[in-house]
Regions:
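A detector of short terminal or domain-flanking linear segments
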Residues: 1-182
């Protein structure tokens, strides 16, 4: 390789993993969770706010926001109920509960660090088995509670306590702008 007279620039070293990752470069796994429609709309608004303003550290996408909210919530549960240690992983063939809600829930797809996804499943199983965490009976309910708490804090800090609004404009009949060309 030809030299241009300048010394090579070393690649940056990322020594601190992002919130939710056990280590830099950890593998991720696809995950889907169902959350209430109104929470999904707040999530969309928060992601838009974060990407437009840059005021929410480490949040550039829906996956980032879900990952950070889940990490904070699960870490708090581990501190409160398991001396800061991760909860045991549920059996590999364990399946979550079916839907037990009456309002419209929306499925969201994200990619989570493998270790965080396992911690979410372990915490959800603990919460369901012990009834020590009110309202958390499944991974979906855990993610819902984590997002609601995290978004409420963001709304207090960045939006004068008002809920974030879904940035997609609604047309008559509930259609979105994009749907009129589909």
């Amino acid at each position: 390789m030809a030299s241009d007279g300048f010394p090579p620039v070393p690649a940056p070293e990322f020594t601190d993993p992002l919130p939710g990752y056990a280590h830099v470069g950890e593998k991720r796994t696809p995950a889907s969770y169902s959350i209430p429609q109104d929470l999904k709309q707040r999530l969309n608004g928060a992601v838009r706010h974060a990407s437009d303003t840059g005021q929410v550290p480490h949040v550039e996408s829906q996956t980032d926001l879900v990952r950070i909210a889940a990490h904070h919530y699960v870490t708090d549960l581990e501190r409160q109920h398991n001396n800061g240690d991760p909860f045991p992983n549920p059996a590999s063939n364990a399946r979550g509960r079916g839907p037990d809600h009456t309002v419209t829930w929306i499925k969201i797809g994200v990619t989570m660090p493998v270790s965080l996804h396992q911690r979410i499943l372990g915490a959800a199983r603990f919460a369901d088995d012990t009834d020590l965490v009110p309202g958390v009976t499944s991974a979906n309910r855990l993610i819902t509670t984590a997002l609601d708490e995290f978004l409420t804090a963001l709304e207090r800090e960045h939006h004068h306590g008002r809920p974030f609004k879904d940035p997609r404009r609604r047309l008559p009949g509930g259609r979105t702008v994009a749907s009129q060309w589909a």
